[in-house]
């Protein structure tokens, strides 16, 4: 709403048909949706605004963690670090492949020169409200903003 649209919640499986029939005019997703979800058959412009990143995390209950030996904790931490690095490599390759396929076989144009500051300004009120509603979010957002 803050960006001038009318958000519509729907299952991912309904997005293609909704785009096809004009129920929705666009979708928010990563580049792979253009190819795996076939959205590039309908959506011919993709704006790369980097408003979201894939923050995959590994979680474990504190109760379980405390019952694991320090040696095994280190093994788990190292495996998590290694899998994170491998995931980054695989994800980057998947994105590159999706972009190439979307451009060459679907005719999708990629717009990379996006006015990100305009998006930040338009959503600043929403972000402020969210920070008030959920204590601690401001600190997390500051950490996210500090990452380049």
Provide a role label for each language-model segment:
Residues 1-148:
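N-terminal secretory/targeting leader peptides
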């Amino acid at each position: 709403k803050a960006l001038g649209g009318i958000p519509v919640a729907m299952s991912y499986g309904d997005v293609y048909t909704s785009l096809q029939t004009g129920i929705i005019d666009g979708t928010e997703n990563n580049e792979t949706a253009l190819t795996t979800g076939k959205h590039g058959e309908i959506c011919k412009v993709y704006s790369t605004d980097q408003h979201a990143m894939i923050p995959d995390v590994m979680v474990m209950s504190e109760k379980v963690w405390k019952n694991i030996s320090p040696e095994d904790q280190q093994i788990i931490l190292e495996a998590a670090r290694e899998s994170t690095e491998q995931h980054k490599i695989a994800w980057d390759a998947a994105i590159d492949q999706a972009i190439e396929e979307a451009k060459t076989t679907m005719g999708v144009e990629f717009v990379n020169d996006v006015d990100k500051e305009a998006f930040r300004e338009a959503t600043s009120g929403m972000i402020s409200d969210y920070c008030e509603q959920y204590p601690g979010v401001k600190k997390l957002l500051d950490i996210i903003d500090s990452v380049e």
